[in-house]
């Protein structure tokens, strides 16, 4: 199967400062990839290089086997067959929704019957057929983003690029628009690359996620694999919350840390030092009379919240604060048992 997108060893610097450093990844036909990372890690620059708005220093980019950038090739934006949706939509204020969508076809008019049919199909797909005669200033933020997607889809591009398209919307609207836009992409069979800073969004909607840091891709994997088997501590902490401790491995598949001796997931040899990470949902708290226990704790303080209970505990010399979705009613100062569900993650060489 020919990859919908292939990036090989892509690098880009601005004024001798590396922004992209040896980026390589591939995207299957119909796949939705989310690129996540902290601000300034190079996500948007990567999208701009794919679109042709920035020229990489080195590397190759191909779409469905067709080279669009290499040492000897640099196709202009209009010849790359890419759709691009940015944060604010960027619609033409003097054009109606219909004409903005038609602009994606190159002439802004939709002259032929085939073009008009395509425009109407994209308006229907994105749920804005009834808005065809309106101007951008008459639309909500969510409606403007739907128009931007319709315009990007109109010329039937090989790939859609979306740069944080939901970040300017309020939470409730963001959720609805996000679900509708991704459903439209899947219904149209389009491969797409989303840039996002929202890890929950990526975990819920991506087929795969690429985690970036300082111009490099730390890991590309399915949401489940990335969360359960992160390649390193940076990827683990970016994609989800974690409680970390310095630790040392034992020969029996355990590690010694501030909570005592815990089972770990690691193939490193005994004696290896590094960082142990536990996901918050792995913890559960039980009365001291619980039949099984590996971690004995003293409850310091419990604070009920809207969706969870915040509990401060002392385990030996370690003070730990957990947000548990459900917890037994325990008085401050009482002894309790902290149960760990499954092994902790261990990252060699990552010392705190």
Curated annotation (Swiss-Prot):
GO terms for molecular function: ABC-type ferric iron transporter activity; ATP binding; ATP hydrolysis activity. It comes from the Bacteria. Its main location: membrane. Residues 5-239 form the ABC transporter domain. PROSITE patterns: ABC_TRANSPORTER_1 (PS00211), ABC_TRANSPORTER_2 (PS50893), FBPC (PS51242). The keyword Repeat does not apply. InterPro entries: AAA+_ATPase, ABC_SmlMolc_Importer, ABC_transporter-like_ATP-bd, ABC_transporter-like_CS, ABC_transpr_FbpC, FbpC_C, FbpC_RD, Mo/tungstate-bd_C_term_dom. GO terms for cellular component: plasma membrane. Its EC number is 7.2.2.7. Keywords: ATP-binding, Cell inner membrane, Cell membrane, Ion transport, Iron, Iron transport, Membrane, Nucleotide-binding, Translocase, Transport. It is found in: Cell inner membrane. ATP binds at residues 37-44. Disulfide bonds: none annotated. It is a peripheral membrane protein. Pfam families: ABC_tran, FbpC-like_RD, FbpC_C_terminal. It catalyses: Fe(3+)(out) + ATP + H2O = Fe(3+)(in) + ADP + phosphate + H(+). Belongs to the ABC transporter superfamily. Fe(3+) ion importer (TC 3.A.1.10) family. PANTHER family: PUTRESCINE TRANSPORT ATP-BINDING PROTEIN POTG, SPERMIDINE/PUTRESCINE IMPORT ATP-BINDING PROTEIN POTA. The complex is composed of two ATP-binding proteins (FbpC), two transmembrane proteins (FbpB) and a solute-binding protein (FbpA). Part of the ABC transporter complex FbpABC involved in Fe(3+) ions import. Responsible for energy coupling to the transport system. This is Fe(3+) ions import ATP-binding protein FbpC. The lineage of its organism: Bacteria, Pseudomonadati, Pseudomonadota, Betaproteobacteria, Neisseriales.
């Amino acid at each position: 199967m020919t990859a919908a997108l292939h990036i090989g060893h892509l690098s880009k610097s601005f004024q001798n400062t590396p922004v992209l450093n040896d980026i390589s990844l591939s995207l299957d036909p119909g796949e939705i990839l989310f690129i996540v990372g902290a601000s300034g890690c190079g996500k948007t620059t990567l999208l701009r290089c794919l679109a042709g708005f920035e020229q990489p220093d080195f590397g190759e980019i191909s779409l469905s086997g067709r080279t669009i950038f290499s040492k000897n090739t640099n196709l202009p934006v209009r010849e790359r067959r890419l759709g691009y949706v940015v944060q604010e939509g960027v619609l033409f204020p003097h054009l109606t929704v219909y004409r903005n969508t038609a602009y994606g076809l190159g002439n802004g008019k939709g002259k032929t019957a085939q073009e008009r049919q395509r425009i109407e199909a994209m308006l229907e797909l994105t749920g804005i057929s009834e808005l065809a005669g309106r101007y951008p200033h008459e639309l909500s933020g969510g409606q403007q983003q739907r128009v931007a997607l319709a315009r990007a889809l109109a010329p039937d591009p090989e790939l859609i690029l979306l740069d944080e398209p939901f970040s300017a919307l309020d939470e409730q609207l963001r959720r609805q628009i996000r679900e509708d836009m991704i459903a439209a992409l899947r219904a149209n069979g389009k491969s797409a690359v989303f840039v996002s800073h929202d890890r929950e969004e990526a975990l819920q909607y991506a087929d795969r996620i690429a985690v970036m840091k300082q111009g490099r891709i730390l890991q590309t994997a399915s949401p489940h694999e990335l969360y359960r088997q992160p390649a390193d501590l940076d990827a683990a902490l970016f994609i989800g919350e974690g409680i970390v401790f310095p630790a040392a491995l034992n020969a029996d598949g355990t590690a010694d840390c501030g909570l005592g001796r815990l089972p770990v997931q690691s193939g490193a040899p005994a004696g290896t030092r590094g960082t142990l990470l536990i996901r918050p949902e792995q913890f559960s708290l039980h009365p001291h009379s619980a039949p099984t226990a590996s971690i004995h704790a003293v409850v310091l303080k419990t604070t009920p919240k809207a969706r969870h209970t915040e509990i401060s505990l002392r385990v030996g010399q370690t003070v730990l604060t957990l947000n548990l979705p459900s917890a037994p009613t325990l008085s401050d100062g009482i002894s309790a048992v902290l149960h760990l569900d499954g092994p902790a993650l261990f990252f060699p060489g990552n010392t705190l």
